């Protein structure tokens, strides 16, 4: 089993000669022989997928597993039922005295456990991101760090998490808390960049087709109406479930404000002064952003603590679904679980899309992705097919090691996504999951049940701020070309 098992059998004699040298070198080195601990056995079932795609799936599964473990350790119900410990899982006293010299040891559950598991996963991805910087060829020996050594990497990840549990609370929380906050906010900004780039790419692509064919114009119209309909239905449902005539003033003000934002962005998208500098600007991208604003509003409202009022001498809970009636209600976790599922799906999408765009456009992809112009319309609008050469590496097209014919694989020597960018995105995602589960700034008494049923003001305002940041980012994209034109115009 050697490198030929990974790169595939050659279809021509020239291709065999081209890669024969690389295969011989890699097979003969101890570096690749050690990789037999993982790559062949783990990826042998992925005959219909490429190695890089299988690797990406395995890393996603690792991250999902770590996140699930964090949820279990944060759940007071699970800890009490499985271990019977009302105050958390304690480290054995003998091991505690040996490691710390006293009986004051970290609790192996709760927010401290979440911080330590996420510290291990974040360090795991950050180290790989550093080691894989400026990697451009899938045949490079460094690429095996990403695609191989699965058993060793799993043991290394477990070792990092175990080592994190040996760090006392007073040394872990102060520094790692601020690192987590910064990483979490950075990941939120990354998500906002991706959603605005997604909306702009879709609009540019289909507007290009609408200028040539009426069928594309019909597609633009239907998509725009569809997104505005979803945003409108979402707003109605939010007013119905998250407001009450006798309270919930903050929810009413927030929903009204965000609806005004949606209307303002829609008007600016079709304003003549904006379209003069951006001819492709239209309601399609504004409708996508409006729909996303409604989702962020829903996420924020479902994360706030309920409001309590006194009615006829009794306390009544309002401002959450199922709790707006003047009668005792049991908190419903279904909405919170639904919101958390969407959130984690967005996390995985952001990690994968960021790594692809980083490989396609280079380190400055956050800027270049907005400037890309489509030559012809296509249904697959979110993935540009070709870009200009970057740093003398030749034209970067969509690499052919993803479900492409063998003839295309012969010509492809590029990565299908940036390995370093992929791991750095998962580094930020690990920090984002950590601070989200532990209520951001109020992590001391975080519990899974409270996080998803009772909420916290810290999480609420973080999500509201992310919604406002999305509005400002899209507003900047609309106004930046106009402001730049006025600044460059000579005075009369």
UniProtKB/Swiss-Prot annotation:
The keyword GTP-binding does not apply. PANTHER family: SERINE INCORPORATOR (PTHR10383), SERINE INCORPORATOR 4 (PTHR10383:SF5). It is found in: Membrane. This is Serine incorporator 4. The chain crosses the membrane at residues 58-78, 113-133, 148-168, 179-199, 217-237, 254-274, 281-301, 330-350, 421-441, 464-484. Belongs to the TDE1 family. Incorporates a polar amino acid serine into membranes and facilitates the synthesis of two serine-derived lipids, phosphatidylserine and sphingolipids. Keywords: Lipid biosynthesis, Lipid metabolism, Membrane, Phospholipid biosynthesis, Phospholipid metabolism, Transmembrane, Transmembrane helix. Its main location: membrane. Pfam families: Serinc (PF03348). It comes from the Eukaryota. It is a multi-pass membrane protein. GO terms for biological process: phospholipid biosynthetic process. GO terms for cellular component: membrane. The keyword Hydrolase does not apply. InterPro entries: TDE1/TMS.
């Amino acid at each position: 089993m050697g490198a030929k098992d990974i790169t595939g059998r050659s279809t021509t004699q020239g291709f065999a000669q081209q890669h024969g040298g690389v295969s011989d070198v890699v097979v003969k080195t101890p570096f690749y022989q050690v990789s037999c601990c993982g790559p062949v056995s783990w990826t042998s079932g992925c005959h219909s997928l490429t190695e890089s795609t299988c690797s990406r799936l395995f890393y996603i599964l690792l991250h999902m597993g770590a996140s699930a473990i964090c949820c279990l350790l944060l759940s007071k119900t699970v800890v009490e039922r499985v271990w019977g410990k009302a105050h958390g899982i304690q480290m054995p006293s003998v091991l505690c005295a040996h490691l710390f010299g006293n009986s004051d040891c970290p609790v192996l559950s709760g927010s401290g456990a979440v911080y330590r598991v996420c510290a291990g996963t974040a360090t795991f991805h950050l180290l790989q991101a550093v080691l894989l910087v400026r990697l451009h060829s899938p045949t490079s020996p460094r690429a095996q760090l990403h695609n191989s050594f699965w058993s060793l990497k799993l043991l290394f990840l477990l070792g990092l998490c175990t080592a994190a549990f040996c760090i006392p609370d007073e040394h872990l929380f102060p520094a790692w808390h601020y690192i987590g906050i910064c990483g979490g906010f950075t990941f939120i900004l990354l998500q906002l960049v991706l959603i605005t780039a997604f909306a702009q790419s879709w609009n540019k692509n289909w507007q290009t087709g609408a200028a040539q064919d009426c069928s594309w114009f019909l597609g633009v119209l239907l998509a725009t109406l569809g997104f505005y309909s979803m945003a409108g239905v979402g707003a109605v449902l939010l007013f119905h479930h998250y407001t009450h005539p006798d309270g919930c003033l903050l929810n009413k003000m927030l929903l009204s404000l965000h609806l005004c934002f949606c209307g303002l962005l829609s008007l600016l998208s079709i304003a003549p002064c904006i379209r003069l500098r951006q001819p492709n600007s239209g309601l399609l991208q504004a409708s996508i952003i409006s729909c996303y604003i409604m989702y962020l509003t829903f996420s924020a409202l479902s994360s706030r603590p309920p409001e309590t009022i006194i009615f006829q001498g009794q306390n009544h809970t309002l401002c959450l679904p199922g709790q707006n009636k003047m009668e005792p209600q049991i908190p419903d976790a279904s909405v919170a679980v639904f919101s958390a599922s969407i959130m984690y799906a967005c996390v995985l999408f952001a990690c994968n899309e960021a790594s692809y765009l980083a490989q396609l456009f280079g380190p400055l992809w956050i800027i270049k992705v907005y400037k890309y112009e489509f030559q012809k319309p296509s249904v697959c609008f979110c993935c540009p097919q070709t870009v200009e050469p970057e740093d003398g590496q030749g034209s970067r097209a969509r690499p052919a090691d993803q479900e492409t014919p063998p003839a295309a694989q012969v010509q492809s020597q590029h990565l299908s996504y940036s390995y370093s960018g992929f791991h750095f995105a998962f580094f930020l995602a690990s920090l984002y999951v950590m601070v989200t589960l532990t209520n951001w700034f109020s992590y001391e008494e975080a519990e899974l049940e409270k996080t998803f049923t009772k909420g916290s003001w810290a999480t609420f305002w973080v999500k509201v701020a992310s919604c406002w940041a999305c509005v400002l980012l899209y507003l900047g994209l609309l106004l930046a070309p106009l402001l730049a034109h006025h600044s460059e115009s000579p005075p009369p």
